[in-house]
Structures are given as structure tokens and as C-alpha cells.
Amino acid sequence: MSTPANGKGRISQVIGAVVDVEFDGELPSILNALETFNNGSRLVLEVAQHLGENTVRTIAMDSTEGLVRGQPVSDIGTPITVPVGPATLGRIMNVIGEPIDERGPVNADTYMPIHAQAPAFVDQATESEVLVTGIKVIDLLCPYAKGGKIGLFGGAGVGKTVLIMELVNNIAKLFGGYSVFAGVGERTREGNDLYHEMIESNVINLEGESRMSLVYGQMNEPPGARARVALTGLTQAEYFRDVEGKDVLFFVDNIFRFTQAGSEVSALLGRIPSAVGYQPTLATDMGALQERITSTNKGSITSVQAVYVPADDLTDPAPATSFAHLDATTVLNRAISEKGIYPAVDPLDSTSRILDPMVVGEEHYEVARGVQQILQKYKELQDIIAILGMDELSEDDKVTVARARKVERFLSQPFDVAQVFTGSPGVQVKLEDTIKGFKGLISGEFDHLPEPAFYMVGNIEEAKAKAAKLMADAA
């Protein structure tokens, strides 16, 4: 039985992020929030286990340095509650909803608990409409569904964060609705960059109305905060969906850190690990989060989640568990990034539920499959090329290889958010221009253009202009 709010306890043991609290009366419920004060600031603890008759084991949401045994703790009586609604827009908050942008308190009228049930099956809605991103390789080969769940998979340093930033930039700017960005266990510098990028593009307006709220629990935070910050962001997105009936964009960078923090917490709680050292509740934890990210009859949540792939192994339990929940998967490949092709999306490994002629139309489907076919053929010929050289190929195969190399380069694209590094301005390409360009490429219409003309351009007209410039320079 749970204790009434304000049950009093005292700290009996502190081991890193795990704090044991003794209560004389009834114990607080599992997932209840407890609060104490550490060096003058509020510290929230979340109940994880009941030990014996009068002790609970809790996970701290902030550093436990400075806590002492015997220190008083009070039970709030509910799970962690965070501010939701329009007051959160344009603000940066931490896992417990406190502002960390030095712009005063968040004056929200409504607070909601971060733990909630997923919407009932009958309330869920599915629609199959393409969400155009302006990024050629995504729109053509693994189109995103409005109200769907999208995963960006990649190892260390292949461009997940740059791609998610570009998606925030392209979609959140054009998108009239609200967006929520949850930074889970990633670099503080990137969080800071995103904030300033959003201010520059007026998605966050410091004086007027903003369209995005940010929730950060970065790499330096204890595991309790990293394991819960995605739920804090999701709670804010759910409010806009359920109460205000809005279509919401929900970005998470990085969902792997949520799993990683869960694994750290699990080890601290003394649970026996499962495969590769992950927590035994890996699938349950992931399911509890992912099932809440869905579209209902009231509104939709379209989520884009970056998923770090440890050691580039897609069969690792953490990325493998998240695959099952997604509508579209965009896989980033180190071999492609080594060729200097960015975004380094693997055109043969990336999939989408809506790449279907009934949804995207016959022409789009045929062109996408044609592109994949030509790239697959090139992949099969690479062994022969490596051993015998290009000269041993048949004439048809030589044409296929030449086209495939152009297709590969045409799948690259300069990004707005990378402009400071590359010096070339970013471009967004309309879906019809993307289809037109690739249709011409695979049918041989542009066989006369040189390969470099297709690298880091937007639509096919830009490639033609670049080819003319290259020829003029060579003359």
C-alpha cells in the first residue's frame, strides 16, 4: 500500500546513484518520487525496489555527492511530475522539469506524471501519408510516414546527430505544429548548438511565441536522469497530442543512451544481466516507452529517434530491440561515409513500411526499386572489379557500374546544419524533383554527364549546371 503524501523517511545508505531510504510507517509505491535537499538544491529520488519491511531502494535524478545517512526524505505521493503545455515552448528543462536555460521559472498551469499508460488499442489511429523531409535518399528509398516512428541507426561518428539536426531544421521549420526534442545522454555542446540554431531559425523566439521545447539529460548526468529524460520529453509531447489535439514532432537523440542508462541502473539495483550485459527488462523498458509514442484519434506524434549502434553491430540487443517498434529505419553505414558521401545512408539496408505503390504511387515505387536494383548489381560486381579490374566486365556491366557510381554520388546532399563545416549552402529537394532525377539516371538519360557533377548537389538541374561548369573549367 502506498503512503499518503509527505510520508517521512531518512537515508540509510548511499551507493553512487542508488539511495536506500528507511520509513517508519507504510512504504511509498514503486515509481513514486521522493525529495530531499542536497547542498541547498532539491534532489528527487525515484522508488525502484522495496527491501524488507521498512526500506525502499531509490534511483537519484542528480548527483548524490554530499548526501549523509540519517538525512530526512519526504514522499511526494506521486511519480515525478513535469510542467506541460504552452509554457514549456522555447524552454530547456531537465528530467524533473526544472528550467536550465537561466530564463526564470517555467510558469506552467499543468503538471503531468512522466509514467503513464500507452493509449488503448481502440484509440490508436494509423495513416499512410508521406512526410517529405527534403533529403533525397530518405524521401526516395525509406520515406517517413506522418505519425510514424523513425529510427536513424549508425555507429560512432557516421552522422546521426547531424542528420537528426537537419531533420529538425527541415521539418520543424516548415511544420506549423509543435516539436519536442529530448537530448538523452548526448554531448552538451550539441544541445547548445541546437538551441542556438533554433533561435536563429525562429523556431524558438525568446520574445514571442516558440514552437519547440527542449528536454536535456546529457552525458554528464547520473544514470537515473538519462533513464527518465526521454519519458519527460514524451510526456510533454503527449500533452500537446491528447489535450490540445495537435500533431507533434518528437525527436530523441539518442535512444540507445536510454537503454544504456537502464543497464547501469539495473546493475546498481543488483539485477542479473542478460545478453551482452544489458538489463533483463530491456524489451519491457523499450516497449513501455515506444508504445506511448503513437498516433491517436485526437492527434499524432511523429517521432524521429537516433539509435547508436555499438561497434557497428546491428544485431546488438539494444538496436535490435528498437527495430521491432519502427515504421521506417534509416541505416547509416561507415563504408559510405568513408567514401565522403553524406548523409551516409545505406540505400540497401534502409527500409520503410510505406514504400508501397498503394501509398507512394507507382512511379516513386518503380524508381526506388530501380535505384536499389542497380546498386545491388554494383555491389555484386565489386568483388570481380577488385580481383580482375573494370576491363574484364561486359559492356552492359560497365554501363551498370558507371550509372551506379553516379546514383551513389547523387544520393549525397549538402546540409544546412553542416554549412559551417563544408562551406556549401544546404539544399532541400522536392520529392517530384528527386524522383525525376533518379528516373533519368537509371534510364541512362544522363550517361553523358561526368561522375563528379552528381556529388553534393540538390536536384538534377544543379547536377547539369555543375557538369557544364566542370566541362568549361576543363576546356
Curated annotation (Swiss-Prot):
Cellular location(s): Cell inner membrane
SUPFAM superfamilies per UniProt: C-terminal domain of alpha and beta subunits of F1 ATP synthase, N-terminal domain of alpha and beta subunits of F1 ATP synthase, P-loop containing nucleoside triphosphate hydrolases
Function as written in the Swiss-Prot or TrEMBL entry: Produces ATP from ADP in the presence of a proton gradient across the membrane. The catalytic sites are hosted primarily by the beta subunits.
Binding site for ATP: G154, G155, A156, G157, V158, G159, K160, T161
Family that this chain belongs to: Belongs to the ATPase alpha/beta chains family.
Protein name as catalogued: ATP synthase subunit beta
NCBIfam families for the chain: atpD
Species of provenance: Hyphomonas neptunium (strain ATCC 15444)
